[in-house]
């Protein structure tokens, strides 16, 4: 494995860590409605668990309400039950074959709890990025040990990996700040 391969690999893995972090952030509820909030809700569809998006159409009714329209009338009760049991603090209301999911306003205490969760998720993502840096540096040291590259090349590559790490950690910090601001906005 060459130095370029190691750098390319670590950058791709760091980018995947950022994407996973963004997905985790999307699941954290703010005061506003967005359909991504229900993405991980699983519905019992004739004996197998499937994502809600495979059995219903998700739309925004207004800024604080998600509309869920199951494609089969028989699924309305199951979809409503799945949303209620998803531990998101949501209380869906059914009218006909449309399920309305209003977003309750967040209390000040709940907002503070959520910002702590966001910061914790951010730290976890940073640790993942730093672990990738460590793995890349170990691979570079192995190349030096095997006499495939010089120590100067290893030092330069190590500096490049550090710059990638700094860039991705800064991106995580930016995402955390943005999510905190979104949560604290009343």
UniProtKB/Swiss-Prot annotation:
Function, in words: Responsible for the release of ribosomes from messenger RNA at the termination of protein biosynthesis. May increase the efficiency of translation by recycling ribosomes from one round of translation to another.
Protein name as it appears in the record: Ribosome-recycling factor
GO biological process, alphabetically ordered: cytoplasmic translational termination
GO cellular component: cytosol
The entry's keywords: Cytoplasm, Protein biosynthesis
SUPFAM superfamilies tied to this protein: Ribosome recycling factor, RRF
Record GO terms (molecular function): ribosomal large subunit binding
Signal peptide (residue range): none
Protein family according to the UniProt entry: Belongs to the RRF family.
Annotated compartments: Cytoplasm
């Amino acid at each position: 494995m060459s130095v370029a391969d190691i750098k390319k690999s670590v950058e791709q893995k760091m980018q995947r860590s950022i994407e996973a972090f963004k997905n985790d952030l999307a699941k954290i509820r703010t005061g506003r409605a967005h359909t991504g909030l229900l993405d991980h809700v699983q519905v019992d569809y004739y004996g197998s668990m499937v994502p809600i998006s495979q059995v219903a159409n998700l739309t925004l009714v207004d800024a604080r309400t998600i509309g869920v329209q199951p494609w089969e009338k028989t699924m309305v009760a199951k979809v409503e039950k799945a949303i209620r049991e998803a531990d998101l603090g949501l209380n869906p209301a059914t009218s006909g074959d449309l399920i309305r999911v209003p977003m309750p306003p967040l209390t000040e205490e709940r907002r503070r709890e959520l910002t702590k969760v966001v910061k914790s998720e951010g730290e976890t993502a940073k640790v993942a990025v730093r672990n990738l840096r460590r793995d890349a540096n170990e691979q570079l040291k192995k190349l030096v040990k095997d006499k495939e590259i010089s120590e100067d090349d290893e030092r330069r590559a190590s500096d490049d990996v550090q710059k990638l790490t700094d860039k991705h950690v800064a991106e995580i910090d930016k995402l955390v700040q943005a999510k905190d601001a979104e949560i604290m906005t009343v």
